[in-house]
Amino acid sequence: MAAVGFSAGAWVTLSVAETNAFDLFEPQSKLQLRAAAAFYPPCRGAATRPGMPTLIFIGALDDWTPAAECTNRVAIWGNEGPPIELIVYPGAYHGFYYQHLQPGTMLFGHWLEYNGAAVDDATRRLRQFLDRHLN
């Protein structure tokens, strides 16, 4: 099983990936996560390195959860442990996966906009990532 989340849900995904502590959210569960994928997470809040293969997608123009925070966090985490891959999409904003954000819009002072090229690439990469780590 893998955790996949978007924005605030991506923060939950990274939090669960830190310790594989799925029981924080499902106390009676015996489920174990094997991989995590986070779309535009707030990386500054992710203190501990994920303990499982993790894939992070973010837009270079995201002003809500800035790509620089994820780039810095991944650098701090280093290369020890399970693989962590960060994909930064040039020209993409927060919410790039949501087709209804076309044209883009402001929300709480942040620009949100669909980006079809980023979606196509992220979908392909996510499928490959899940195939690698779940099969």
Task: List the model feature ranges, each with a label.
Residues M1-G51:
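Primarily recognizes the serine-hydrolase "nucleophile elbow" in alpha/beta-hydrolase
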Residues P83-N135:
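C-terminal catalytic histidine-bearing segment of alpha/beta-hydrolase fold enzymes
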Residues A8, E69-R73, A122, L126:
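Stable alpha-helical elements in mature extracytoplasmic
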Residues I56-I58:
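Short beta-strand/loop motif that positions the catalytic acidic residue
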